């Protein structure tokens, strides 16, 4: 029985794109499901654009996502001799030929075909040159490329695991170039040679590669190699139905962007998995084990998926579904594991207290458990939750106007409440609430004026956990200090 072997072959010309990450994820899922192997192959033949920084970024991004590989990374440039040997084999067997047509002559023919509204394909000028004609051109020093000699047939077809039967008429397939005039084999050939060497049994990739697939199938056959199973995923588009790309969308399509903006790795994996696939029901959230069980190529959508990024949207910095998924995992993950992740954020912002890992460990975990319900990313713990871990928290403009500045008397009422809190021996939620409501009664105010004003003064926020859970979490000393200083909000 043939071993199931897949590959993820990124080009190191930039960061790891979320489209590439989705491709890697689908390959990883399929390999794991079928007890197969997944190979990481860096296709670095574009020496002008390939960089070590990009290679590191891709590997780091995959590692952060938890997409592990059984082999690699292999580098395509390390196997240049294999690619040249394959090209020579095709030339020697007559399945490839030297084409001496200049770029200028090809451009002229193309323009003439356009004007005549005829096929733009290569016309086969050099397909049947005699040995004497070839020798004459070589003697004259004429440069040439190698073209694959497409065999005569009615059509070429294959069964795509997602798109179904794909059939292309022979008349639509030109004799295509496989080696440049400088002797460098093209991606089309290199990719096939590498897949043959790596014994790849399944190729899962984007639909933008489908134009190459028919040609590559011909190369597999010409090289007497088994043809892998192909599965071409529809592309991911933006909400204007344009292909998402590094050039058009910038860092928002980089995996690193989500890591740096406080996403959990599995939350992004879950989002990417659902970006073009479903199990056929309404289920959205999958553990790793559940997704490994449910995933199938046949359930990948045949139509393009939409990445709902709205540039400049002040509320959602990326697709709202991605944010919602991250929020779900933050709310529901093991609190100890969350604590470790939040620790890194607090350390980065200078908010970490070593006591949180020692005598205040219970307080620390209880606090992040209390506040996580309204947070979307790990970054929120050091920004929206800053008041729990430091004194340099920001009082947001909206709650400041709504809860504080609207009531001039709070300039005196909140410090007064602070004094009453200072005298309490029992600083429980029940007792602090009683005192706050008692003060409101004395001042003939609705309790919400005092309570909401206090919330904004001591946390900077409009909403959050129960106010008196906040009071006891912050503790008597900090509550008294912040209430006494509340008058500064009116400055």
Swiss-Prot record:
Catalytic reaction annotation? tRNA(Glu) + L-glutamate + ATP = L-glutamyl-tRNA(Glu) + AMP + diphosphate
Q: How does it assemble?
A: Monomer.
Query: NCBIfam families, per this entry?
Result: gltX_bact
Q: What does this protein do?
A: Catalyzes the attachment of glutamate to tRNA(Glu) in a two-step reaction: glutamate is first activated by ATP to form Glu-AMP and then transferred to the acceptor end of tRNA(Glu).
An example molecular function term from Gene Ontology annotations: zinc ion binding
Q: Which UniProt keywords apply?
A: Aminoacyl-tRNA synthetase, ATP-binding, Cytoplasm, Ligase, Nucleotide-binding, Protein biosynthesis
Q: What's the protein name?
A: Glutamate--tRNA ligase
Question: Which GO biological process entries does UniProt record here?
Answer: glutamyl-tRNA aminoacylation
InterPro entries reported in the protein's UniProt record: aa-tRNA-synth_I_cd-bd (IPR045462), aa-tRNA-synth_I_codon-bd_sub2 (IPR020751), aa-tRNA-synth_I_CS (IPR001412), aa_tRNA-synth_I_cd-bd_sf (IPR008925), Glu-tRNA-ligase_bac/mito (IPR004527), Glu/Gln-tRNA-synth (IPR000924), Glu/Gln-tRNA-synth_Ib_cat-dom (IPR020058), GluQ/Sye (IPR049940)
Its main subcellular localisation, reduced to a broad class, is: cytoplasm
- Source organism (scientific name): Desulfotalea psychrophila (strain LSv54 / DSM 12343)
